């Protein structure tokens, strides 16, 4: 049932920006791609599945500076945290790289030179805001000021968060630098542009968007193609604004900038979105170099299919700039760009950290929740369209428990026990004839399920599989093996019924394996067989084959797990109440000051190891409106993860690079959001209503990470 000629596939997912941990949107996309890759491999197809960190840009450069790190060190620290997510959710990339890799530098510069040779690079003088104190041009998000529409203060340089107006940074009233507070000045600079408006680019893109791939199907989903076509020509939008068609694309940024230098242009760097998609090719080249294979020869193979999985928020980069860059630099263009929607929660509410509607991937794992529950649930929701999908806790519980436990695992639990206890683990297959209706019906849907997986119609595939599970359970109810087991004269019938059930369970496992790879491994061990391939659907367990004793395959989802997953801590964590009074008299006279704790001996205090720590990274905690996740360097050769209830008082970017005081020898604590490896000290008032502030302790200049406080 495999393809006559194996396919050769180069598969990627969108690159995550290397300024923070993975969120659930990343995990959803990786699961979608991983299922497709695993399915293709079960068909006997060759797949190279690669990813990378998007490592360049002003935000990373600035965050690294605040943390007292080089951008490379900052990105490396972020990258070190990727493995726990990927391994945790059984996402099996063949290679993970970085856009700051040597391969990406070389490829990005060569693509630029090829585009320049093709006459598609032009230079223009642009006017930008410049921070005279920082001595750098400011990206839009690092310029703030008063909104020109609603006059709300402290709005970003490209849009207002209050009235949603979109404008140019030069439209801001009283603009200032978000980095230094200085008033920016307008300066001219020469920038380089990829001339996407060139008739050659327009003609190619119109053909690529509407044209057919080698499989006779379009490169894009129909709804995506229709949207992209709207960008090709000037038009008046429903809101009265004018769209000008394809514009030339500014691909350069001025120093200082963390990125890839533009050849023969000192002080100029590629805009991050030019070298980011090149990172797909660079990660593949890095993988091929490790294997001793030639990258150019690999990419030149006519049968190679280049497949990109992305979210709908980055369609323009992947369906306009990226194909045109590849085409006119003389490279292979994408065969498919598969676009998915966003993940919402509770019937369409967007994921929100502040409202407690976020789904934090690490918290999910730290609660001991089975990653394959989530893989199965998301797969049930995913289709070939770029529609948003909804995570509903009640639906999650019902679907996992009903389908995976009640329908699928239940088959093995009913049959394997009898085979082990009464027949020494031996199955029979003399019943397995070509005209066996029960098993034949199960095998006959293989091609239908195969097509649905290939088309990324996972929800339809799983519904078809569960229809087969229903039929198998109906067979159980009709034949009642528990009744057959009561009479010795029914021994042969019992063995045949249970053998049929295990064969049916084996076939269902093949169908589910792309979604549930770890559960499939357990089933392969139970059935004492080699790793299952799609072509094994028609090959039953041999007659007298011995299976292993049944052991529990999967537990049920408990509602309390979902309560914990979306629960927000009710109290501020890891803060210390410190009196605000300045003298003993004032403390005694002020009833709002918290009473001093009972007296302790010096030996008690000596047990507490207080150390100076540097905050090298800080980020919001998905699902919590009180916690920040701090990454701390205490000078011990490793970084620590600490949760602190200071979100109401601080923005993460304001803490990066600061020194603080932490309890270094506090036992690690398993929290709902992960492991906290210490406690940072902060002050807060006993009466939070009159003084709601939280004040993190910050040592005087001269203190260094690792110094003891006492």
UniProtKB/Swiss-Prot annotation:
Under catalytic activity, the entry for this protein gives:
tRNA(Met) + L-methionine + ATP = L-methionyl-tRNA(Met) + AMP + diphosphate
CDD domains assigned? Anticodon_Ia_Met, MetRS_core, tRNA_bind_EcMetRS_like
Question: Where along this sequence does the record place binding of ATP?
Answer: 353
**CC terms in the record's Gene Ontology section:** cytosol
Q: Which GO terms describe its biological process?
A: methionyl-tRNA aminoacylation
Top-rank taxon, per record: Bacteria
Query: Quick check: keyword Transport in the entry?
Result: no
Name the UniProt key words of this record, in alphabetical order: Aminoacyl-tRNA synthetase, ATP-binding, Cytoplasm, Ligase, Metal-binding, Nucleotide-binding, Protein biosynthesis, RNA-binding, tRNA-binding, Zinc
The free-text note explaining how the cofactor binds reads:
Binds 1 zinc ion per subunit.
Instruction: Give residues annotated as binding Zn(2+).
Output: 147, 150, 160, 163
Q: Which SUPFAM superfamilies match?
A: Anticodon-binding domain of a subclass of class I aminoacyl-tRNA synthetases (SSF47323), Methionyl-tRNA synthetase (MetRS), Zn-domain (SSF57770), Nucleic acid-binding proteins (SSF50249), Nucleotidylyl transferase (SSF52374)
| Motif window: 'HIGH' region | 16-26
Q: Tell where it localizes.
A: Cytoplasm
Cofactor(s) demanded:
Zn(2+)
As for what it does, the entry says: Is required not only for elongation of protein synthesis but also for the initiation of all mRNA translation through initiator tRNA(fMet) aminoacylation.
The similarity annotation says:
Belongs to the class-I aminoacyl-tRNA synthetase family. MetG type 1 subfamily.
Q: What is this protein called?
A: Methionine--tRNA ligase
Q: Which gene encodes it?
A: metG
